[in-house]
């Protein structure tokens, strides 16, 4: 047997109209018989209308299968897009802040726009009067500050000059006291030096006088005829001349010793004592 497909509309299937041209019922049936023709069955073939639905289901399944592995890529793209959007937002915020600051700078430099509005004559007069009052007040303050500074400078200068004078007077007094003390010390030292010199000279003269008779006796013994029989006794004139020469020598020797002692006294005490003793033993 051969099957003949028959297509029916929805109304015909529902029984609204009877079938035309003696066609069979709405559903396609196929009657098959076995070789024994004991069993019959009806098979419904799929119509063409159901085929696109299956194809669409297969395509949708394929599309779902294709979408599943792309999830990670989509997430990456979304993350990148969010980062780009955040960067754009930050950039826009920075631009707005820069614009605001530039606008504030221009307003600060050029002044507010309401200040640039031309004023009436009455308003101008009032503003000028206010400005004059302010300028006068400022000038008065400046004058007062200048006068105050001048008085301070004068007072400070007077104080400084008085302090300087006091310091100078103190220094002069200290110098005078110092000079007086030095002069007194010098006078005392000179007096002590002179007293010591006089004492030394007196002692030296005493020693020299005590030693001079011994020297004269020794000289007389040498000049006596007993010691030198061939020698002749000197005349009194010669003895006077010898006595004068001896006095001159004594005076010069004592003077030399006093001068040298004064020179020696300026050095060390031990050194000058040793030198003086050595001079005494000459």
Swiss-Prot record:
Q: Where is the composition biased (Basic and acidic residues)?
A: 212-224
Per its UniProt entry, which superkingdom is the organism in?
Eukaryota
- Listed as disulfide-bonded, the cysteine pairs are none
Q: Which residues cross the membrane?
A: none
Main localisation? cytoplasm
Q: Which organism is it from?
A: Rattus norvegicus
Write down the Pfam families for this protein, in alphabetical order: Ermin
| Known role | Plays a role in cytoskeletal rearrangements during the late wrapping and/or compaction phases of myelinogenesis as well as in maintenance and stability of myelin sheath in the adult. May play an important role in late-stage oligodendroglia maturation, myelin/Ranvier node formation during CNS development, and in the maintenance and plasticity of related structures in the mature CNS.
**Binds actin as annotated region, ranges:** 263-282
Is this entry keyworded Cytoplasm?
yes
**Biological process according to GO:** actin filament organization; morphogenesis of a branching structure; regulation of cell projection organization; regulation of cell shape
UniProt keyword Cytoplasm, yes or no: yes
Give the sites modified to Phosphoserine. 72, 212, 224, 228, 231
Amino acid composition bias (Polar residues), ranges on this chain? 1-12, 21-30, 225-234
Q: Where is this region: Disordered?
A: 1-71, 212-246
* Name the UniProt record assigns to this protein: Ermin
